[in-house]
Amino acid sequence: MFNLDNPFWNTVSKLCDLVILNLLFVACCIPVITIGSSITALYVVMRKKIRNEGSSVVKEFFKAFKDNFKQATIIWLILLPLGLLTIYEMYLMTWVELSSLAIIKYVFFSFLIVWILIVSYVFPVAGRFDNSIIGTFKNALLMSIYHLFPWSILIVGVNLLPWFLIFSASGLKLIYIQVMCWIGFTIGAGINSFIFEKIFQKYIDAKEESN
C-alpha cells in the first residue's frame, strides 16, 4: 500500500507536482510584469513532465523562469499594451453606431485574433528554441497560421475556455476560479504541451536533416 513505486502513489505524486507547479505559476504572475516569464517557465516544466525528464518541479520552474526572464519579459511588455489597447478600442466602438466604423472594427477584431494566436505560441516557442525576440515573434506567428487547423484553434480554445466559464457562469464563478488557482493552468498547459511537442518536433527534425 505504501510502496511509492506503485501506480496509485505515482499518480498522487504527479497530481501534487501539477498543483505545486500551478501555485508557483499563479504566484509568479501576481506582479503582472512577470507573466511572460511565468508562462514560459510553465511550458518548459510541462514539456519535461510529459517527457518524464527533470526532477524537482520547484527547481525546474525557477531555473526556466530565470533563464527566460529577460526575453520573455520584453515579449510580454510588447504584447500587453497592444492587447489592452486593442480591447479598449473595440470596447469604445461598441458604443458608436456608425457604418463608417465597420471596417475599422473588423481591422481591430482581426488584429485581436492575431494577437491571441501570437500570445498562445510565443512563450512556448521562446522556451523551446533559442532565437532573437524578433525571430521568436516571427516563428510564433508563422507556426500559428501554418498549423491553424486544427492545432492552433484547439490551443486557443484550451486557453480561452476557462476564462469564458469564469465570466459567463456567475453561479459557478468562484468554483472555476479556485480550480484555475489550484490546478487549472497546469492542465491547460499540459494539454497544449502535447500539441506543441507534435508541432515543434517537425521543425526540430527538419533542422537535423538539413544539418
Where are these regions (language model features)?
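Helix-coil boundary and N-terminal low-complexity module in membrane systems
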Residues: 1-108, 115-211
